[in-house]
């Protein structure tokens, strides 16, 4: 088994963890492709991606084209003479010319058990939908969106308290090893390509701040899953009104489900040290950890000590 010459394409920390694994392996990373530096923070200063920072630390050439569609970009890729391209959360579309550049193709690490969740937010949607299991898939890329033939899958459980943050960490711990296993056996054909079953596919739409607003006409179970799925971004939230009539927005970090009470959706049923209990279409959502604007997250008990007027029994949110 000879070491492979690899082009790595990725952008966030999740991708950087895969690059780190490659750098510690027998394989050679010839170059790294990552998205252009983006403005960040209040000062909107340009910030390099996690992948770029790691690559430069190891003196690996970094390229940041805005697109891979230009002929000169594709020609440069070809001249690098790599065996394979590894793509992890890169964020740019790979045109057919790029997909056909490398003898062993382009491999992608995807954060779901394909074809269950294709698209931009597979980790979040798995929690949102109430899936009990998820995992990572290593696939050969084609022109479709996460539609390529699957080479290797690794599973992990989704616990009842799982957030996107914790699940992201789980997948980041198992995915690099899965990638290396595929790379080590790629030339020998040790991994048989499996065509995806289109009838089992779902599209994991991007999350939005609009979707993160709690909709009390859903069930308490659905809302509790939303709260976990949308943590750390965009964070589920709701709006209440204080005694002065001012609207107050609160993010929700933690909640639990209580038995149903026959009250209109959005009605505050109780507000005490156990939490703020709100009626939903099915069941009661008990809000346990919240964050008012400009404050740190706090327990419902601590919030009620200073802001009890925000939560009147019988008030409809």
From Swiss-Prot:
Gene Ontology terms: cellular component: cytosol
Keywords: Protein biosynthesis, Transferase
Domain of life of the organism encoding this protein: Bacteria
Classification via Pfam families: Formyl_trans_C, Formyl_trans_N
Binding site for (6S)-5,6,7,8-tetrahydrofolate: 112-115
InterPro entries xrefs: Fmt, Formyl_trans_C, Formyl_trans_C_sf, Formyl_transf_N, Formyl_transf_N_sf, Formyl_transferase-like_C_sf, GART_AS, Met-tRNA-FMT_C
EC number, UniProt record: 2.1.2.9
Top EC category: transferase
CDD domains per the UniProt record, alphabetical: FMT_core_Met-tRNA-FMT_N, Met_tRNA_FMT_C
SUPFAM superfamilies, alphabetized: FMT C-terminal domain-like, Formyltransferase
PROSITE patterns documented for this protein: GART
The protein's role, per its UniProt record: Attaches a formyl group to the free amino group of methionyl-tRNA(fMet). The formyl group appears to play a dual role in the initiator identity of N-formylmethionyl-tRNA by promoting its recognition by IF2 and preventing the misappropriation of this tRNA by the elongation apparatus.
Record-linked HAMAP family: Formyl_trans (MF_00182)
Family that this chain belongs to: Belongs to the Fmt family.
Protein name: Methionyl-tRNA formyltransferase
């Amino acid at each position: 088994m000879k070491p492979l010459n690899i082009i790595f394409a990725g952008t966030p920390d999740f991708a950087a963890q895969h690059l780190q694994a490659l750098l510690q392996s027998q394989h050679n990373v010839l170059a790294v492709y990552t998205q252009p530096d983006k403005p960040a923070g209040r000062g909107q200063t340009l910030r390099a991606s996690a992948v770029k920072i790691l690559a430069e630390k190891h003196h690996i050439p970094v390229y940041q084209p805005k697109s891979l569609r230009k002929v000169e970009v594709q020609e440069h890729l070809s001249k690098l003479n790599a065996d394979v391209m590894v793509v992890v959360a890169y964020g740019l579309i790979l045109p057919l010319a790029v997909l056909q550049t490398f003898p062993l193709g382009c491999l992608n690490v995807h954060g779901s058990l394909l074809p269950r969740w294709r698209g931009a937010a597979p980790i979040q949607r798995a929690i949102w939908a109430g899936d009990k299991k998820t995992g990572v898939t290593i696939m050969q890329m084609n022109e479709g969106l996460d539609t390529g033939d699957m080479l290797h899958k690794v599973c992990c459980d989704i616990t009842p308290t799982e957030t996107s943050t914790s699940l992201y960490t789980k997948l980041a711990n198992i995915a690099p090893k899965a990638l290396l296993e595929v790379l080590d056996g790629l030339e020998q054909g040790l991994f048989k390509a499996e065509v995806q079953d289109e009838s089992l596919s779902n599209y994991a739409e991007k999350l939005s701040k609009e979707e993160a607003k709690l909709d009390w006409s859903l069930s308490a179970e659905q809302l509790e899953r939303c709260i976990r799925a949308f943590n750390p971004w965009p964070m589920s939230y709701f709006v209440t009104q204080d005694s002065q009539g001012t609207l107050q927005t609160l993010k929700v970090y933690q909640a639990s489900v209580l038995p149903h009470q026959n009250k209109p959706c959005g009605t505050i049923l109780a507000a005490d040290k156990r939490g703020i209990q709100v009626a939903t279409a099915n069941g009661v959502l008990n809000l346990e950890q919240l964050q008012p604007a400009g404050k740190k997250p706090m327990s419902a008990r601590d919030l009620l000590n200073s802001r009890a007027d925000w939560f009147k029994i019988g008030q409809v949110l």
